[in-house]
Amino acid sequence: MTQVMKYTVFSTPFGWITCFGSVKGLKKMTLPQLSPQQSMDLIGEEIDSAEHDPDFFNDVIQQVLAYFDGEEIAFNVKLDYGDATPFQKAVWEAARTISFGQTESYSGIARRINKPGAARAVGTALRNNPLPLIVPCHRIIGADGGLCGFGGGFAMKEALLTLEKASD
């Protein structure tokens, strides 16, 4: 049986976010973009055959908006990692354990998943993270504490970390 895919686009104080998923869970979510179209374009061609259903994503939307209001949110969302590798899933789940307002290094994530020395592979897995914010890759920093590697750009990474620190 074919899975009915759904999507919605909504506005946040940081920009427009698109959610994409099914009853199996949230499969993709964009970082905030300047326009709804830019946000939808990041999902890819899959969105063309999906059903627009804002109500389906109401829980996700409410949690994301609370996050941008500075609430300490541990996202409680059913996720669908699709065809991700076991390593990617382990990295993403380890990233989800980093608390609001905290950071961890790539090598720290590698140690958490019992793969010391795999910091670069952790970076690759995070670069392919389809669920930023939910899988908070913005909380991953360099071993020296510097901001590095973030698909949303350094300005967005810094803004998200600043939002979380200001809410501590």
Where are these regions (language model features)?
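Substrate-binding/gating loop at the entrance of the active-site cleft, primarily
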Residues: I98, N129-L131
